[in-house]
Curated annotation (Swiss-Prot):
Annotated organism of origin: Pisum sativum
Keyword Iron-sulfur set for record: no
Domain of life of the organism encoding this protein: Eukaryota
Reaction(s) this enzyme catalyzes, per UniProt: an aldehyde + NAD(+) + H2O = a carboxylate + NADH + 2 H(+)
InterPro entries: Ald_DH/histidinol_DH, Ald_DH_C, Ald_DH_CS_GLU, Ald_DH_N, Aldehyde_DH_dom, ALDH7A1-like
Record-linked Gene3D superfamilies: Aldehyde Dehydrogenase, Chain A, domain 1 (3.40.605.10), Aldehyde Dehydrogenase, Chain A, domain 2 (3.40.309.10)
Entry's family note: Belongs to the aldehyde dehydrogenase family.
Record GO terms (molecular function): aldehyde dehydrogenase (NAD+) activity
Keywords: NAD, Oxidoreductase, Stress response
Induction: By dehydration of shoots but not roots and not by heat shock or ABA.
UniProt-recorded name of the protein: Aldehyde dehydrogenase family 7 member A1
Record-listed E.C. numbers: 1.2.1.3
Positions that bind NAD(+): 244-249
Length: 508
């Protein structure tokens, strides 16, 4: 491999070498763009190199994907589900090396890396069952001898643009459902995790080849913003799923909507946990610790705001601070590590700038707030006491920084939870049914994910994942999210000899 090749023999198990072609187009590995390096964030050493796609490569891929869609849409949905089942089995067979690759290239700890790959496997399993349930409603017609019902058909091509923090799981949320729905998929992985894009695509491509199906049913492109912009503006792609910042997501939405396409946006989260005076404190502290520190604060569902009832404030803060001071930071592939590196050097600079902004706005660093001296991108998980009115509290700092604030009653806590532009995930710790049902009701949390007595992160695939407000409004993975990947037609059939008109209209 590259200069960081010690103990990386597992990469060969998933088809990776020192140099790799970064795009799978029309059933072939080809790319004519620049060569980029995949970097290990624990050491900032090169793992391997990848050749990116050009816009000409993209165009070739889109033409092939459009043609493949004509074949794929005619395959019965349960047969499409069988292909996705085989994809899940292929990923399952390489669960350990793929999980290690996620830990190596992204930086999350090994348990989380393996968990991420398990998530795409779970999405495959979920989608297999879904392939036999893509049914529409039968609607009573007001006209005699008429039948009215819904039919769901494929959209065509689904574009999927994923982010570095979940470099393959988010693909699974989208691609598995899109494929069983009869769509072809064009995937642009994150520019800084190209090896994951290549490795996952190799396994998917082998399944289509083994079943004598067009390779262009699944297209993968490693590249930068030019490829993403091409996907957003391409009228041949009726649906674009984008995961990233609210700032970039707004541009994607604007570009896609100008051509009357549809978007699924999974954008910034600024998630809060509320601890009431009747909470199970031990359960709350454990949950906060995982929610705020897991993945080094680089989940969209990371807890960034902690609201503590004034009567439990000191107790919770003391216990949480003690946990923070004991956390093991280091190589994510080593046993016992709980916090790996931030993904890039620029992320470390953002962390440092964030700490400076916190201090300038009156924040008090309880613990952490520093960068570790090392070759890697390691920072110390940080707890901050700060006013709820501080500007930094309204923003997402994509790092392990937790803002801690007091409240007096439930109404104030809910208002604080809802006071930020984002609306992804939220959780409350309480034992009172009245508090629980107010929290999940119309006067409670305004987020897309509303939890009770569990962390803000670690969502299951069976529910629809997504948020409100500046988080984008998208819903992916489970529940009825599949409907966004298909085209609904309302069909009315007259099986009689008369022509009664709706609303009793008599026309001639």
């Amino acid at each position: 491999m590259g200069s960081d090749s010690n103990n990386l023999g597992f990469l060969k198990e998933i088809g990776l070498g020192a140099t790799n072609i970064g795009s799978f187009i029309n059933g072939q590995w080809k790319a004519n763009g620049p060569t980029v390096h995949s970097v290990n964030p624990s050491t900032n050493q090169v793992i391997a190199s990848v050749t990116e796609a050009t816009l000409d490569d993209y165009e070739e891929g889109l033409r092939a994907s459009s043609e493949a869609a004509k074949t794929w849409r005619t395959v019965p949905a349960p047969k499409r589900g069988e292909i996705v089942r085989q994809i899940g089995d292929a990923l399952r067979a390489k669960l350990d090396p793929l999980g290690r690759l996620v830990a190596l290239e992204m930086g999350k700890i090994l348990a989380e890396g393996i968990g991420e790959v398990q998530e795409i496997i779970d999405m495959c399993d979920y989608s297999v069952g879904l392939s036999r349930q893509l049914n529409g409603s039968i609607i009573p017609s007001e006209r005699p001898e008429h039948m009215m019902f819904e039919v769901w058909n494929p959209l065509g091509i689904v574009g999927v643009i994923t982010a570095f923090n979940f470099p393959c799981a988010v693909l699974g949320w989208n691609a598995c459902i899109a494929l069983v729905g009869g769509n072809t998929v064009v995937w642009k992985g994150a520019p800084t995790t190209p090896l994951i894009t290549v490795a996952v695509t190799k396994l998917i491509a082998e399944v289509f080849e083994r079943n004598n199906l067009p390779g262009a049913i699944f297209t993968a492109l490693c590249g930068g913003a030019d490829i993403g912009h091409a996907i957003a503006k391409d009228t041949r792609i009726p649906l674009v799923s984008f995961t990233g910042s609210s700032k970039v997501g707004a541009l994607v939405q604007q570009t896609v909507s100008q051509r009357f396409g549809k978007t699924l946006l999974e954008l910034s989260g600024n998630n809060a946990i509320i601890v009431m005076d009747d909470a199970d404190i031990t359960l709350a502290v454990r949950s906060i610790f995982f929610a705020a520190v897991g993945t080094a604060g680089q989940r969209c569902t990371t807890c960034r705001r902690l609201y503590l009832h004034e009567s439990v404030y000191a107790n919770v803060l003391e216990q949480l601070t003690a946990l923070y001071k004991q956390v093991k930071i280091g190589n994510p592939l080593e046993e016992g590590t709980l916090v790996g590196p931030l993904h890039t050097r620029s992320a470390v600079e953002n962390f440092k700038n964030g700490i400076s902004a916190i201090k300038s706005q009156g924040g008090k660093i309880v613990t952490g707030g520093s960068v570790l001296e090392s070759e890697g991108n390691f920072v110390v998980p940080t707890i901050v006491e700060i006013s709820a009115d501080a500007a930094v509290v309204k923003e997402e700092l994509f790092a392990p920084v937790l803002y801690v604030m007091k409240f007096k009653d439930l109404e104030e806590a809910i208002a604080l939870n809802n006071s930020v532009p984002q609306g992804l995930s939220s959780s409350i710790f309480t034992q009172k049914p009245s508090t629980i049902f107010k929290w999940i009701g119309p006067s409670g949390s305004d987020c897309g994910i509303v939890n009770v007595n569990i962390p803000t992160n670690g969502a299951e695939i069976g529910g629809a994942f997504g948020g409100e407000k500046a988080t984008g409004g998208g819903r992916e993975a489970g529940s009825d999210s599949w409907k966004q990947y298909m085209r609904r037609s309302t069909c009315t059939i007259n099986y009689g000899s008369e022509l009664p008109l709706a609303q009793g209209i008599n026309f001639g």
